[in-house]
């Protein structure tokens, strides 16, 4: 499966090739929302790989179908809160708080483990916490350091957008989310969607690590997803026996 397609088809193919895969091997492409940094590569992917099926929130799915002909049966709308079967997994969408008509995170449930993804949200809601609670591993957003953003070169309107409840999570907000998830049993976290302009991996990791340790969750594994290259994550049940 591929989550979002915000990069070019060439980069998608290069990334898959590092895993000895091609786009033809994809069972599904999951789309979280319609911003270009999440869908820019989708038109070319769908044009050249006719067997690729896309799963997206309803508003995004309908927009994709209107934008291009010949996609009937290849775009699958996922109503928020409902689940669909994908081979040996169950995919569930939950709403995030972002400045688009509709944006979602996903939880993928297999036979023995659950994996969640939650980025592009300006705040954390009870519904999001409920969806991610007890996941064995999750990717969560640590988009910006507030001081870097405020002192940076972004125009005022963009800073306000990012800092709003429909923008992106700061390192501090991410730390609060991490602790809340740790209380539900989540034991492996990956920080993602870091701004190149307004954050640094070390800043994000330190903010979240200190918060987790301060709340007694030093056993939680914490990693930062790189902007380039791979991060391999093995998702295993938290309660797996030795």
Where in this protein do the model-derived segments appear?
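Active-site metal-binding motif and surrounding structural segment of the metallo-beta-lactamase
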Residues: 8-56
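Conserved beta-strand hairpin/beta-sheet module of binuclear metal-dependent hydrolase folds
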Residues: 1-19, 104-120, 137
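Active-site neighborhood of phospho(di)ester-bond hydrolases with catalytic His/Asp-centered motifs
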Residues: 3-6, 26-34, 55-57, 116-119, ...
